[in-house]
Amino acid sequence: MKLLLLALPILVLLPQVIPAYGGEKKCWNRSGHCRKQCKDGEAVKETCKNHRACCVPSNEDHRRLPTTSPTPLSDSTPGIIDNILTIRFTTDYFEISSKKDMVEESEAGQGTQTSPPNVHHTS
């Protein structure tokens, strides 16, 4: 009976002392533990269920691992598609009228006078 009374407090206190028996869940890519309060040297990274904090050791750099790895490019030289995509589109539009065209228009326009040819530049 004395052995049972001695074993009962040990079984009750064991989950409080040893985290593996306490059922603390892993968080932050399995580098942290869900706790009510973080210990010294730990930082809160996110919140767990039941209003607990995800405590991660702050002396190490714990970053989330990417879910996918970047696809390596087989050819690093730019191709024709890259050149097409990087071209800035600028369009210059010129209206040029010659004296010959002006004379023909003036003769067809019943002798009206016209000014010298105008050159318009728009971009």
Swiss-Prot record:
UniProt record, GO biological process: antimicrobial humoral immune response mediated by antimicrobial peptide; cell-matrix adhesion; defense response to bacterium; defense response to Gram-negative bacterium; defense response to Gram-positive bacterium; innate immune response; killing of cells of another organism; negative regulation of cell adhesion
Modification after translation: The three-dimensional structure formed by the three intramolecular disulfide bridges is indispensable for antimicrobial activity.
Gene expressing this chain: DEFB118
UniProt family annotation: Belongs to the beta-defensin family.
Composition skew (Polar residues), residue ranges: 109-123
Disulfide bonds: C27-C54, C34-C48, C38-C55
One function term, GO molecular function aspect: lipopolysaccharide binding
Propeptide span(s): 65-123
Signal peptide positions on this chain: 1-19
Keyword field: Antibiotic, Antimicrobial, Cleavage on pair of basic residues, Defensin, Disulfide bond, Secreted, Signal
Protein's job: Host defense peptide that exhibits antimicrobial activity against both Gram-negative bacteria, such as E.coli and S.typhimurium, and Gram-positive bacteria, such as S.aureus and B.subtilis. Inhibits cell adhesion of E.coli on intestinal epithelial enterocytes. Causes rapid permeabilization of both the outer and inner membrane of E.coli, leading to morphological alterations on the bacterial surface. Binds to bacterial lipopolysaccharides (LPS) with high affinity, and may thereby be involved in immunoregulation through LPS neutralization.
Compartment(s) where it occurs, according to its Swiss-Prot or TrEMBL record: Secreted
Location (main, coarse): secreted
Protein name: Defensin beta 118
Tissue expression profile of the protein: High-level and epididymis-specific expression. Most abundant in the epithelium of the caput and is also present in the lumen and bound to sperm.
GO cellular component: extracellular region
Region: Disordered, residue numbers: 100-123
